[in-house]
């Protein structure tokens, strides 16, 4: 689809043409586990990647394909892969590059679930994560060594709301021929396309603002198509892959080489571990995308107004919101974000833990739950 189309048009149209059989304008939900092969040769061509098409819904599904193409267009990427959750998206992005003995360098201001995965789970598989303070990009350079295979950051840190200098971190990573993986959940492509600033891989928990209504769980990985995986340090891409017919993903894909990362993720981690998204959840996230631009604009406005209100409240001791001009993240966020500063506000109240619990327990309109990105306001402590 034309790259000249506006963001809101891509939200509605990217990745889809009316169904050729039924002429349905809306995206159908394809509830099927598998697909009929036209012939033995057709099946062989699909498995050998001579032809791309549907084999089994653990690998791909037509509803899922529209979602992937639409998000890839919104992020400015070459291809995308939708998965069962944001957590599985991050995990697959890492194990698609790293094996036992490898390392990644990560910002330390991460969502708690990601931090636990990096600090406790990945080491069990022999993958070491070095955590650094992302406020000084040179910290990444100091932590990189010959075992490093990737650099990981979040656009806006969860929950501290610090904004990372994406381009500076990307420059350092690329000097060492390393890919940058950016979790853009808190910004979505409406606020920033991280690929435009040097990200090689973008991950997003669609459960949050992309879905926008708290009705489904899903994640997505977007491949910029710009990173060269032929460097021998990326042995998973350069050595014959025993789990998929001995293919060398950095060398044997022909015209598909630019999307080697996503193809390998689909054919190795997803095919063999199975964290696939359901067609119904894919369809729900497509509904969310249709209003993403409208919701994010209003959510950012409401968050800024809330932050200003809290800033002047006598019982509030501090407020973090990247859109406040005196916030430590404002100078950096203002450089990158042109459509708003996000939909989250973090603050502290006087009186310590007891006061915090009393505040949470007396909420009326706001819901107390473990999620973010819902259309309905929520609070979490």
What are these model-derived regions, one by one?
Residues 1-51:
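N-terminal glycine-rich, Lys/His-bearing helix-loop that initiates the first secondary-structure elements
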Residues 34, 39-91, 113-121:
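Conserved N-terminal alpha-helix of the aminotransferase class I/II PLP-enzyme fold
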Residues 16-18, 31-37, 208, 225-226, ...:
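Glycine-rich beta-alpha junction loops
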Residues 19-21, 210, 274, 335-337, ...:
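Short Gly/Pro-enriched turn/cap motifs at secondary-structure boundaries
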Residues 296, 304, 311, 315-381:
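Conserved C-terminal alpha-helix-loop-beta "cap" of PLP-dependent enzymes
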Residues 52, 78, 281, 285, ...:
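Short amphipathic alpha-helical segments
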Residues 2, 11-13, 17, 79-313:
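Conserved PLP-enzyme active-site core in the AAT-like
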Residues 10, 29, 54, 283, ...:
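A broad, low-specificity signal marking well-ordered, structured residues that form hydrophobic/aromatic
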């Amino acid at each position: 689809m034309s790259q000249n189309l506006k963001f809101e048009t891509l939200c509605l149209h990217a990745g889809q043409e009316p169904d050729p059989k039924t002429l349905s304008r809306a995206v159908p939900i394809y509830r099927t586990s598998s697909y009929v092969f036209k012939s033995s040769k057709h099946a062989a061509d699909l498995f050998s990647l001579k032809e791309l098409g549907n084999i089994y819904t653990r690998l791909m599904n037509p509803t899922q394909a529209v979602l992937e193409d639409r998000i890839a267009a919104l992020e400015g990427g070459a291809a995308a892969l939708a998965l069962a959750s944001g957590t599985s998206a991050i995990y697959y992005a890492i194990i698609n590059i790293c094996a036992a003995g490898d390392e990644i360098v990560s910002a330390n201001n991460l969502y708690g679930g990601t931090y636990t995965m990096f600090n406790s789970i990945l080491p069990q598989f022999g993958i070491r994560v070095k955590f650094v303070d992302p406020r000084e990009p040179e910290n990444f350079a100091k932590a990189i060594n010959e075992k490093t295979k990737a650099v990981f950051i979040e656009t806006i840190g969860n929950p501290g709301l610090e904004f990372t200098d994406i381009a500076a971190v990307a420059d350092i990573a690329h000097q060492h021929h390393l890919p940058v993986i950016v979790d853009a959940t808190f910004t979505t492509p409406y606020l920033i396309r991280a690929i435009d600033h040097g990200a090689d891989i973008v991950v997003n928990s669609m459960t949050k603002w992309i879905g926008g209504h708290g009705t489904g769980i899903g994640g997505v990985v977007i491949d910029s198509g710009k990173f060269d995986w032929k460097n021998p340090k990326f042995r998973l891409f350069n050595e014959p892959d025993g789990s998929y017919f001995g293919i060398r993903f950095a060398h044997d894909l022909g015209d598909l080489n630019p999307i080697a990362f996503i193809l390998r993720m689909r054919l190795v981690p997803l095919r063999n571990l199975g964290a696939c998204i359901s067609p119904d959840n894919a369809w729900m996230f497509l509904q969310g995308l249709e209003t993403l631009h409208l919701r994010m604009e209003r959510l950012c406005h409401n968050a800024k107004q809330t932050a200003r209100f809290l800033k002047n409240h006598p019982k509030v001791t501090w407020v973090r919101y990247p859109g406040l001009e005196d916030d430590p993240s404002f100078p950096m966020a203002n450089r990158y974000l042109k459509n708003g500063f996000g939909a989250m506000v973090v603050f502290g109240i006087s009186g310590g833990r007891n006061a915090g619990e009393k505040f949470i327990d007396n909420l009326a309109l706001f819901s107390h739950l473990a999620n973010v990105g819902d259309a309905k306001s929520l609070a979490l402590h």
